[in-house]
Amino acid sequence: MVTEQEVEAIGKTLVDSTQPLQARFRALFTLRGLGGPDAISWISRGFEDSSALLKHELAYCLGQMRDPRAIPVLVSVLQDRNQEPMVRHEAGEALGAIGNPKVLGLLKQYSTDPVVEVAETCQLAVRRLEWLQQHPGEATCAGPYLSVDPAPPAAEGDVGRLRETLLDEAQPLFERYRAMFALRNVGGKEAALALAEGLKCGSALFRHEVGYVLGQLQHEAAVSELAATLARTTESPMVRHECAEALGAIARPACLAALREYITDPERVVRESCEVALDMYEYENGQDFQYADGLERLRPPP
């Protein structure tokens, strides 16, 4: 049983800007796992922080928790034009993930936002909510991954056909996302290489999602393309950050060199992502039972 005092201690670590970013991330993922109104309240306090990376991760976690009590704070973040585009985008995506149709009107409104990543995110969230209404009771988390995705995976299982849809920029973004998540679920080298080709497509939002999915897939066939995208200083920081975190999750020796090289990058979100990714690399190659270890850090060993 988790006590109120333990949740508070983990929450204080999350919102304490003097703490190392890795510790704050581990606290965040602990709160996400615990759930409930107190966890949501602590996570919501973090949106005043100066780190866009942390704030974007706060929004992501609130979406994954799928608790409608998080809707008001996510709406306020989406509406706040002082928040960085990657933070507003993640708030829009989180509203789609929660799946409550009451935000459909708001998401439609922001589907024409002047920030293209925000507009595209809200368009996808609208399509997801409409899909949920058309397919009541269908599992959207089916498959080997437990994440709540911005689009349900396509029913197609052929990697070649999925690759064609993924890379066809004339197709609706929603259908390309469906192909992306289907490729992830199929898994293996061929799927990883097909996904990695998506890192060269036109939409920055799309490229960043490809980076995220390759991190979930954790296949080393994608390492060279992820490292090349991280190294491309003309690339959107939102995309480079996702590639860095994917390299941390894949956690092969070749990933380590790339992450160390960009830990002093001029873009704050990139260097912070490398910092968090190196912590993830250590976790993947270490003996820790779980990454979200906020409770273990509070409790003495038995």
UniProtKB/Swiss-Prot annotation:
One of its GO terms (biological process) is peptidyl-lysine modification to peptidyl-hypusine. SMART domains: EZ_HEAT (SM00567). Binds 2 Fe(2+) ions per subunit. InterPro entries: ARM-like, ARM-type_fold, Deoxyhypusine_hydroxylase, PBS_lyase_HEAT. Pathway: Protein modification; eIF5A hypusination. Its cofactor is Fe(2+). HEAT-like PBS-type repeats lie at residues 54-80, 87-113, 175-201, 206-232, 239-265. Keywords: Acetylation, Hypusine biosynthesis, Iron, Metal-binding, Monooxygenase, Oxidoreductase, Repeat. One of its GO terms (molecular function) is deoxyhypusine monooxygenase activity. It catalyses: [eIF5A protein]-deoxyhypusine + AH2 + O2 = [eIF5A protein]-hypusine + A + H2O. Its EC number is 1.14.99.29. The modification N-acetylmethionine is found at M1. Fe cation 2 binds at H89, E90, H208. Pfam families: HEAT_2 (PF13646). Fe cation 1 binds at H56, H241, E242. Catalyzes the hydroxylation of the N(6)-(4-aminobutyl)-L-lysine intermediate produced by deoxyhypusine synthase/DHPS on a critical lysine of the eukaryotic translation initiation factor 5A/eIF-5A. This is the second step of the post-translational modification of that lysine into an unusual amino acid residue named hypusine. Hypusination is unique to mature eIF-5A factor and is essential for its function. HAMAP family: Deoxyhypusine_hydroxylase (MF_03101). Belongs to the deoxyhypusine hydroxylase family. This is Deoxyhypusine hydroxylase. It comes from Rattus norvegicus.
